[in-house]
Amino acid sequence: MEIKSAEFVISNTDVRKCPEGNKPEYAFIGRSNVGKSSLINMLTNKKGLAMTSQTPGKTLLINHFLINNEWYLVDLPGYGFAQRGKENREQLKRIIENYILDREQLTNLFVLLDCRHEAQKIDLEFMEWLGESGVPFSIIFTKIDKISKGRLKENLKVYTDKLLETWEELPPIFLSSSEKKEGRDEILDYIESINNSLNN
């Protein structure tokens, strides 16, 4: 897929205020500092489209970007940042859950995982909840340029083995590096294949 245009449309905390219409939406979510904004900028080839921050948990809004005037890329708030207050965490949880469960246009949710770390309980529980809720999702392992190929292979095996303890089959999995633009074509082609199937 060639990205010809990518433009910011709206930020909000209320799923009812998301764009109207029936364009498919592909949302991206992950723990704070997983590299989500950098990945979005890499996918769209627009360096400043999604704001990157050195401060974990900075993104508190649902951000919609219109791609090629055909589909929306949705940047969801990061989850699991411990320094947020309890009230703030509960508010974020509601924002995320309301979008994921109530947004009919949500076509696929990309769950971002930092490949440098072992399987985290919060990520596994989140994906378990997605499965129980019938939400279609895929996994993107980020920052693959930050560790050796051997370590990457080892970490992926541990992660997939952990998932297969409760899953009959694995969701689609992608490997990415925002700095080296690895995984870009595979992720965009996957989105394009879903869009094509929706149009047929």
Curated annotation (Swiss-Prot):
Residue ranges annotated for the EngB-type G domain, each copy included: 22-197
Annotated InterPro entries: G_ENGB_dom, GTP-bd, GTP-bd_ribosome_bio_YsxC, P-loop_NTPase
GO biological process: one example: division septum assembly
Binding annotation for GTP: 30-37, 57-61, 75-78, 142-145, 173-178
Named cofactor requirement(s): Mg(2+)
UniProt-listed SUPFAM superfamilies: P-loop containing nucleoside triphosphate hydrolases (SSF52540)
Pfam families, A to Z: MMR_HSR1
Domain of life per record: Bacteria
Residue numbers binding Mg(2+): S37, T59
UniProt keyword Nucleotide-binding present: yes
Family note: Belongs to the TRAFAC class TrmE-Era-EngA-EngB-Septin-like GTPase superfamily. EngB GTPase family.
Task performed by this protein: Necessary for normal cell division and for the maintenance of normal septation.
NCBIfam families registered for this protein in UniProt: GTPase_YsxC (TIGR03598)
Protein name: Probable GTP-binding protein EngB
Source species of the chain: Parabacteroides distasonis (strain ATCC 8503 / DSM 20701 / CIP 104284 / JCM 5825 / NCTC 11152)
